Amino acid sequence: MSLLTEVETPIRSEWECRCNDSSDPLVVAASIIGILHLILWILDRLFFKCIYRFFEHGLKRGPSTEGVPESMREEYRKEQQSAVDADDSHFVSIELE
């Protein structure tokens, strides 16, 4: 007898899933969550530069000025610029006598 005839080969029925409760709502919910997580992770990796650039610059725009008169907008811009200028003056070198 050769070795090839002695080797046990699995039949198709042994390869199939033996889970009888695959229609369990918890299993279905876990599968859906897993698939959604995988899709979101792939999209995040593909478009991460666009996504995070939008959040980084989009959140720094400041409050909306829609419906605000132009004079008040200009006053707000001046206040913001003076706050930036005051912050820059913090790093002025001091000369001692």
Swiss-Prot record:
Which residues are modified to Phosphoserine? S64, S82, S93
Q: Where in the cell is it found?
A: Virion membrane; Host apical cell membrane
A single Gene Ontology MF term assigned here is: monoatomic ion channel activity
- One GO BP annotation of this record: symbiont-mediated suppression of host autophagy
Any one cellular component term from GO for this entry?
A: virion membrane
Q: Which residues carry attached sugars according to the database record? A: N20
What are the start and end residues of every segment in region (Disordered)?
59-88
Annotated InterPro entries: Flu_M2 (IPR002089)
Feature: compositional bias, Basic and acidic residues: 71-80
Membrane topology reported for the UniProt record: Single-pass type III membrane protein
How the protein is activated or inhibited is described as: The M2 protein from most influenza A strains is inhibited by amantadine and rimantadine, resulting in viral uncoating incapacity. Emergence of amantadine-resistant variants is usually rapid.
Q: Where are the transmembrane segments?
A: 23-43
Q: Which residues lie on this side of the membrane: Intravirion?
A: 44-97
Q: Where is this protein primarily located?
A: virion
Specify whether Metal-binding is a keyword of the entry. no
Question: Where does the record place the site Essential for channel activity, possibly by being protonated during channel activation, and by forming the channel gate and the selective filter?
Answer: H37
Domain comment quoted from the record: Cytoplasmic tail plays an important role in virion assembly and morphogenesis.
* Reported function: Forms a proton-selective ion channel that is necessary for the efficient release of the viral genome during virus entry. After attaching to the cell surface, the virion enters the cell by endocytosis. Acidification of the endosome triggers M2 ion channel activity.
SUBUNIT field? Homotetramer; composed of two disulfide-linked dimers held together by non-covalent interactions. May interact with matrix protein 1.
What is the protein's given name?
A: Matrix protein 2
Query: Gene symbol?
Result: M
